Design a protein with these regions (language model features):
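Non-heme Fe(II) oxygenase catalytic core, chiefly the N-lobe of the double-stranded beta-helix
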Residues: 1-191
Length: 191
């Protein structure tokens, strides 16, 4: 119901991550819940569920392990990144298979005042092709991801963003998609 979704949204804004364990939801329910949080986006590199292009398939097997093991925020390579992501595990091994979460609000709050002052006016480049460099290097990777690279040119975002609803400051860089801090020399940006 709308009232339940409103309460979930309030909790998400407050806590930044929420978990619903052992939920058996359909693709339609998954999409309906996601719709409540804002416009849905498709990912340019992942396969999707038939008739549900907004639901991506992330699969990791012994034969084909995941390539994304770095800390990151999903789709920061977009001019308008999504508000968040909803992850639903269909098959989870008894050990491993973890998805970890970290608060960039807590990271910001832990910074000293001089560091906050340094970062507040900096911007960073986020690049799809940087995040998918391993996939692009695979045989056929450039051809397979050509359209995704063309449709997602590098974008610039503030290093420190304010959440539009909570007003909290968050660090908005990540090792997967952030290529450089624009205003710093390369050696400092890379540090």
């Amino acid at each position: 119901s709308t009232s339940v979704l409103s309460e979930i949204r309030k909790l998400l804004i407050k806590h930044e991550v929420i978990f619903f364990r052992d939920q058996d939801i359909s693709h339609i329910q998954h999409k309906q819940m996601a719709d409540f949080f804002g416009p849905l986006q498709t990912h340019p590199a992942y396969g999707t569920i038939k008739d549900f292009p907004e639901i991506q398939i992330l699969e990791s097997t012994a034969e084909k392990p995941t390539k994304i093991e770095e800390w990151h925020t999903d789709m920061t390579f977009r001019k308008h990144p999504p508000m968040g992501s909803i992850l639903r595990s269909k098959v989870c091994p008894p050990s491993g298979g973890d998805t970890l979460w970290s608060s960039m609000t807590a990271a910001y709050n832990a910074l000293s005042s001089p560091m906050k002052d340094l970062l507040k006016n900096l911007t960073a480049e986020h690049d799809f092709s940087y995040g998918f460099k391993e996939s692009l290097a695979e045989p056929g990777g450039k051809k397979r991801l050509r359209d995704a690279v063309l449709q997602n040119p590098p974008v610039i975002h503030p290093v420190i963003r304010k959440h539009p609803e909570s007003g909290k400051s968050v660090i908005f860089v990540n090792s997967l998609f952030t290529t450089k801090i624009i205003e710093l020399p390369r050696n400092e940006s890379d540090a």
